Every structure is written in C-alpha cells, then in structure tokens.
C-alpha cells in the first residue's frame, strides 16, 4: 500500500500490525513503517511517539535515523543531529559500516 501511494490504507494496516501483530519483530518493523507514513502525512508528533523506543537492537539504527528525520521536520536541528548520531553509533556497535550523515 505504501509503495502504491495509498497512505490511508497503508496506515490502517500498519497500525493493526504494530499494535496487534503476533511476531515482535514484525511489530517493530510495522512501527517503523507506520512512523514513516505518519511523517509523510505530516503527523510529526504521532510519528515521534511511534519511534520512542526501538523494539529490538536490530531496529535501533533505523528508529534513530527516522527519529532524526521527524525531528528535522519539526525544526529541531540539534535533536535531529543527536538522533542521527545515535543511528551511526548503533550501526557502529553492530559492526556495520555507517554512512556519515550530514546536515
């Protein structure tokens, strides 16, 4: 749904998966994608609420990266930069090559 541009249906399906899915890993992924939809819809506070805590270490960098995007959209440059740095730190801790994020 998201790729097709149908944000309303994508949001409904992702909300269900994030809140009621049986697999914790899939719930985490659904929360991440739901936050991206909310960002696209301009619902920045709701997007940030979905990103408050990564469901697992596997998603931590992605959550932090998207949190940076939401904070940047809110005009909170310093907080966004800190979130991007947290994403880089999570990637580094996981042994992944981190791409340097710039302003």
What do these predicted regions represent?
Residues 1-62, 67, 76:
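Alpha-helical adaptor scaffolds
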Residues 14, 99-103:
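Extracytoplasmic/luminal low-complexity segments enriched in Pro/Gly and acidic/polar residues
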């Amino acid at each position: 749904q998201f790729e097709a541009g149908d944000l309303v249906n994508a949001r409904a399906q992702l909300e269900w998966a994030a809140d009621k899915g049986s697999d914790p890993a899939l719930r985490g992924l659904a929360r991440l994608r739901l936050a991206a939809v909310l960002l696209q819809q301009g619902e920045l506070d709701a997007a940030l609420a979905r990103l408050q805590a990564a469901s697992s270490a596997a998603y931590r960098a992605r959550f932090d990266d998207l949190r940076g995007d939401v904070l940047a959209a809110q005009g909170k440059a310093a907080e966004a930069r800190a979130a991007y740095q947290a994403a880089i730190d999570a990637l580094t801790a996981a042994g992944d090559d981190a791409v340097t994020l710039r302003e």
